């Protein structure tokens, strides 16, 4: 792994967030993610228990992780790829 290795932002399934709430949080936080894409990710999170919702530089990953947690999403620790 190089120093610039990407970091994954992972959202976990839970029993308190709605599909719509997850889709809104993802689409309002992550660049380039539409509400429809957020709904698709929400389905993946629900069906598999987790989903990588963004991957990239550590500083941005930390920011998006904090913002998504602020929306009330259940977050896994950042994962270094």
Predicted regions and their residues:
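Terminal domain-initiation and capping elements
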Residues: 1-81
């Amino acid at each position: 792994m190089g120093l610039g290795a990407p970091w994954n932002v992972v959202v976990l399934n839970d029993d308190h967030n709605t599909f719509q709430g997850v889709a809104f949080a993802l689409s309002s936080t992550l660049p380039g993610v539409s509400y429809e894409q957020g709904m698709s990710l929400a389905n993946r999170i629900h069906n598999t228990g987790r989903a990588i919702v963004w991957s990239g530089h550590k500083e941005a990953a930390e920011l998006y992780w904090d913002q998504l947690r602020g929306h009330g999403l259940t977050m896994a620790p950042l994962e270094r790829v």
